Curated annotation (Swiss-Prot):
Keyword Transmembrane: no
PROSITE patterns, sorted: ZF_C3H1, ZF_RING_1, ZF_RING_2
Name the UniProt record assigns to this protein: E3 ubiquitin-protein ligase makorin-3
Function noted in UniProt: E3 ubiquitin ligase catalyzing the covalent attachment of ubiquitin moieties onto substrate proteins. Acts as a key developmental timer that helps ensure puberty begins at the appropriate age, by inhibiting premature activation of the reproductive hormone cascade. Epigenetically regulates GNRH1 transcription by disrupting the binding of methyl-DNA binding protein 3/MBD3 to the promoter of GNRH1.
Pfam families: MKRN1_C, zf-C3HC4, zf-CCCH_2, zf-CCCH_4
Gene: Mkrn3
BP GO annotations: protein polyubiquitination
Record field: catalytic activity: S-ubiquitinyl-[E2 ubiquitin-conjugating enzyme]-L-cysteine + [acceptor protein]-L-lysine = [E2 ubiquitin-conjugating enzyme]-L-cysteine + N(6)-ubiquitinyl-[acceptor protein]-L-lysine
Biased composition (Low complexity): 9-19, 36-46
Taxonomic source organism: Mus musculus (Mouse)
Gene inactivation effect: Mkrn3 deletion lead to early puberty onset in female mice. Mkrn3 deficiency also promotes DNA demethylation in the hypothalamus of mice.
Coiled-coil boundaries: none
Length: 544
């Protein structure tokens, strides 16, 4: 029985170490040596191989055997089963390091079924023979005895060993931080009796060698408790982690450790600049009855207006007031000069001084744009509205016979060209706000057409022009609007024509209405209707 079980026990002893490391994802210390396992370690499958005529061959446990061996303790000496307390005590789980403890997230603490001792792991990585000891800050841990591995385990393929990687890189891949690796190396060196200087030199040399072997390990993200762990090594072709400011890193550290967030310092709020008190309005207009007892400041006297309008504490207000006073003074001077020029002007028709007329409404000038002769507004309008002269004579100047298109009313006499142009522009802007009485909202006819200064506006709801018979509207409605007489107030005469023209217009209106009613049964063609409409429009535009 012992010979038959010896290979199986050897495989189990070798698979316990490989299975714990490959199945759990972390490295574990070698299992404790039992007497049966130690006795059977030296026994190999040589007798069987010699009997069959085969060369001696080392047997390496497969993945399935490793997994089974990692989940099953080695049998006791003599092939018998272990005692009940040893099987149910769960001591085999203490040989496996807790993966949550490696990441700093184990919630069980000292009650955890898995091992929290890191000294055995460090010795197995470094090949040291020192006995593991319990951590002072983690409480007492189960200590196991370690012996050198057998020849079969030592001659395992190099794929099972991670010594090809540098110490810092390999430890970082399995979850160790840089501080834990340094502390473990210092403790093991101190146990062997090295001095502090030798330890420092060795640590510096190891750090330089590891930095040369690990690609980008110095740019790795620092492990933060409570945040997803990313390891110590940076992938050679992976994306680089974004840089964080020290303030953000401190906030993350505070959040992971459960500490209160740092309260940001409030930004200093600028103090509002107090507005100066307004000036006393009574003192600015004349005299304040309160005098020095007034709650409001009294302004300084302005040289231009002579009032207490300058604020003693506000330089901007003083500058603005002086500028306004200068502009007002310039306007007053221009008005004074205009009045002085107009004082002795005599009308060329009535031969009276314009400013000395009895009726104040007649004290206005009628300025012609093309000449500089002086006329009062009433006389020049009477001259231009006379019918006993030809149109070219009545629209021209009575003295120089230079024709002018319009007369500009003004209270002051203007001679210079620039002032005349400014006066004409102001006159046109004022007239454009008034409705033309000849246009009559689209129902009349303005003889000036597009040259009229008054506003030609259609009633609300109409377009720019009334609906035409060929533009979508009914012809009867169009001609009814055109031929219907316009209702005006008494005293307003829209059409100045003779009695004969009124009678002709009335007869044409009646004839057109009758023709429109008989259009469906008449033999008029479309060309004749268009010709009739054209002749009527031309007649009305000439005689209205």
């Amino acid at each position: 029985m012992e010979e038959s079980t010896a290979p199986i026990e050897a495989h189990a002893a070798a698979g316990a170490e490989a299975g714990a490391e490959g199945g759990e994802g972390v490295s574990v210390p070698p299992p404790p040596q039992f007497e049966a396992a130690g006795a059977s370690a030296g026994v190999s499958s040589a007798p069987l191989q010699q009997a069959s005529g085969l060369a001696p061959l080392l047997v390496t446990p497969g993945p399935a055997i490793r997994r089974a061996a990692s989940l099953r303790p080695a049998p006791a000496e003599g092939g018998g089963a272990r005692s009940g307390p040893e099987r149910n005590s769960g001591s085999w789980t203490k040989q496996i390091l807790c993966r949550y403890y490696l990441h700093g997230q184990c919630k069980e603490g000292d009650n955890c079924r898995y091992s929290h001792d890191l000294s055995g792991r460090r010795r197995s990585r470094g090949g040291q023979d020192a006995q593991p000891r319990a951590s002072a800050d983690r409480g007492p841990k189960m200590a196991t005895r370690w012996e050198p591995p057998t020849q079969e385990v030592a001659e395992a393929p190099p794929a099972a060993s991670s010594s090809s990687l540098p110490l810092i890189g390999s430890a970082a891949e399995r979850g160790f931080t840089e501080a834990e690796i340094d502390n473990a190396g210092i403790r093991s060196a101190a146990e062997r009796g090295f001095s502090e200087a030798e330890i420092d030199n060795a640590s510096l040399a190891a750090g330089a060698a590891a930095g040369a072997g690990a690609e980008g390990w110095e740019g790795a993200i620092e492990f933060v408790p409570g945040q997803p762990y990313r390891g110590r090594m940076v992938p050679p072709h992976g994306p680089e982690a974004p840089l964080q400011s020290p303030a953000i890193e401190r906030e993350h550290m505070a959040m992971g450790m459960g500490m209160p967030m740092p309260v940001p310092m409030p930004m200093p709020v600028p103090m509002p600049v107090p507005m100066p008190l307004p000036l006393c309005r009574y003192a600015a207009r004349g005299q304040c009855l309160r005098g020095d007892r007034c709650a409001y400041p009294h302004g300084e006297i302005c040289d231009m207006c002579g009032q207490q309008a300058l604020h003693p504490w506000d330089a901007a207000q003083q500058e603005a007031h002086r500028r306004a006073c200068v502009e007002a003074h310039e306007r007053d001077m221009e008005l004074s000069f205009a009045v002085q020029r107009s004082m002795d002007k005599v009308c060329g028709i009535c031969m009276e001084v314009v400013y000395e007329k009895a009726d104040p409404s007649d004290r206005r000038f009628g300025i012609l744009f093309s000449c500089n002769h002086t006329y009062c507004l009433r006389c020049i309008r009477r001259w231009r509205s006379a019918t006993q002269f030809e149109n070219r004579i009545s629209k021209s100047c009575p003295q120089c016979r230079v024709s002018s298109g319009f007369v500009i009313p003004s209270e002051f006499w203007v001679e210079e060209e620039e002032e005349k142009e400014k006066l004409v522009q102001q006159y046109k802007e004022g007239m454009s706000q008034k409705a033309c009485r000849y246009f009559a909202g689209g129902l009349g006819h303005c003889p000036f057409g597009e040259f009229c200064f008054y506003k030609h506006e259609y009633p609300e709801g109409w377009r720019d022009q009334p609906p035409r018979p060929d533009g979508g509207g009914s012809s009867s409605a169009y001609w009814h609007q055109v031929l219907e007489p316009v209702q005006l107030r008494e005293g307003n005469v829209l059409f100045k024509s003779r009695k004969k023209e009124h009678s002709v217009l009335r007869l044409a209106n009646q004839l057109l209405k009758k023709l429109l009613c008989l259009r469906g049964s008449s033999s008029f063609s479309d060309d004749r209707w268009l010709l009739l409409q054209y002749q009527l429009e031309e007649y009305f535009s000439l005689n209205l």
